């Protein structure tokens, strides 16, 4: 009989010691997504308003964005992160609340960039909603 090969995979996440990183905040009209990466762009932690338990129109509130930002920041701080740059994208309500939550939890924000994509008259937008 042939021996079975056992693949041993660790279930625990490896803690990295990363001093500084980038916080990407994508704030849409329906949700807020917070991703924290190292300087090369490798994701360390992430959180969304929907992931925090909010559903429907409550996902788009500033409070939901604040909770998502705090959760992602706590995980990043466990990995040794102290200073961050913030890239904000989108027109949503949770933009400022997410940045304030990062500062309140103890991360030092060195730069805030608005990287919202603006078309130079590219694609035709969808037709207007009539309710």
UniProtKB/Swiss-Prot annotation:
Any GO MF annotation of the entry: structural constituent of ribosome
GO cellular component, one term: ribosome
Keyword Transmembrane helix carried by entry: no
Record key words, sorted: Ribonucleoprotein, Ribosomal protein, RNA-binding, rRNA-binding
One Gene Ontology biological process: translation
Pfam families associated with the record: Ribosomal_S11 (PF00411)
Family: Belongs to the universal ribosomal protein uS11 family.
Role of this protein: Located on the platform of the 30S subunit, it bridges several disparate RNA helices of the 16S rRNA. Forms part of the Shine-Dalgarno cleft in the 70S ribosome.
SUBUNIT field: Part of the 30S ribosomal subunit. Interacts with proteins S7 and S18. Binds to IF-3.
Annotated protein name in UniProt: Small ribosomal subunit protein uS11
